[in-house]
């Protein structure tokens, strides 16, 4: 069987934890930040876990990620 190709766009957007979960960045932390509170901006800067319903989709895009 040939090697599977990794979707490069997904490889740049997701990271795998030690337990095999996928982490992603949060939205709304790119621009238009003046009116957002510092607390909200700190929260948006943290990583989030990909929902379990999307786990299979992400794992197909990243065949060698854990």
UniProtKB/Swiss-Prot annotation:
- Check the record and name the InterPro entries matching this protein: Ribosomal_bL35, Ribosomal_bL35-like, Ribosomal_bL35_CS, Ribosomal_bL35_sf
Q: What keywords were assigned to this record?
A: Ribonucleoprotein, Ribosomal protein
Q: Where are the transmembrane segments?
A: none
Q: Which GO terms describe its cellular component?
A: cytosolic large ribosomal subunit
What the entry lists under Pfam families is as follows: Ribosomal_L35p (PF01632)
Q: Which domain of life is it from?
A: Bacteria
UniProt GO BP: translation
Q: What does the record give under GO molecular function?
A: structural constituent of ribosome
Q: Which family does it belong to?
A: Belongs to the bacterial ribosomal protein bL35 family.
Q: What is this protein's record name?
A: Large ribosomal subunit protein bL35
